[in-house]
Design a protein with these regions (language model features):
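Loop-helix junctions at membrane interfaces
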Residues: 1-150
Length: 150
C-alpha cells in the first residue's frame, strides 16, 4: 500500500465514522430499530465502498461512539460484544461480496449476516456477559454498578 492509498483509506474511513456518528446523533430520539438499521447500513456501505479494513474499523468503533452518545448499551462491559456483532456482520459482507456485488451475494450476505450477528450478540451478552455480571458478589456488583452509573 503506497502513501496515497493509505491517505485515501484513512480519509474514507474517517468519512464513514463521521457519517456514523452523525446518524447515531440524529436518530438518537428514534427507535433502536431505526438507529441500528442506519448503523448496519453504514457498516455495509463502508465495507463495499472502501474495503474490508475500513468496514472492520468502523464496526469496531461504532458501539463506543454509541455508548458515548447514550444510545447503545448502558453498561460499558456490553459494548465489546456489540462491536463483535458488528464485526461479524462486516466479515460476512466482506467475504460474500468480495468477488463482486451481485444481487444473489447481497441477499445471501443480508440473511447470513443478520443471523450470525444475532448469534454473536445473543451468545456474548445473554449467555456470557449477563450471567458473569450477575454471579459477582454483592460488594463487587455494587462497585461495578457505581462505575457504570458515572
Amino acid at each position: 500500500m503506497n502513501r496515497n492509498s493509505k491517505i485515501k483509506w484513512i480519509a474514507e474511513t474517517a468519512i464513514f465514522i463521521a457519517l456514523l456518528i452523525t446518524l447515531q446523533a440524529v436518530t438518537k430520539s428514534m427507535s433502536q430499530f431505526v438507529t441500528g438499521s442506519m448503523v448496519n447500513l453504514v457498516l455495509i456501505t463502508a465495507t463495499l465502498a472502501s474495503g474490508f479494513a475500513s468496514g472492520l474499523t468502523v464496526a469496531a468503533v461504532s458501539p463506543f461512539f454509541a455508548f458515548m452518545l447514550g444510545i447503545g448499551p448502558k453498561f460499558i462491559a456490553l459494548v465489546p460484544f456489540v462491536a463483535l456483532g458488528n464485526i461479524v456482520l462486516v466479515l460476512v459482507w466482506g467475504l460474500l461480496c468480495k468477488k463482486g456485488v451481485e444481487m444473489k451475494n447481497m441477499i445471501t450476505a443480508l440473511i447470513i449476516g443478520a443471523l450470525l450477528k444475532f448469534v454473536a450478540l445473543y451468545s456474548g451478552i445473554v449467555k456470557f456477559a449477563i450471567p458473569t455480571l450477575l454471579a459477582l458478589p454483592e460488594k463487587q456488583a455494587a462497585v461495578m454498578g457505581a462505575n457504570f452509573s458515572l
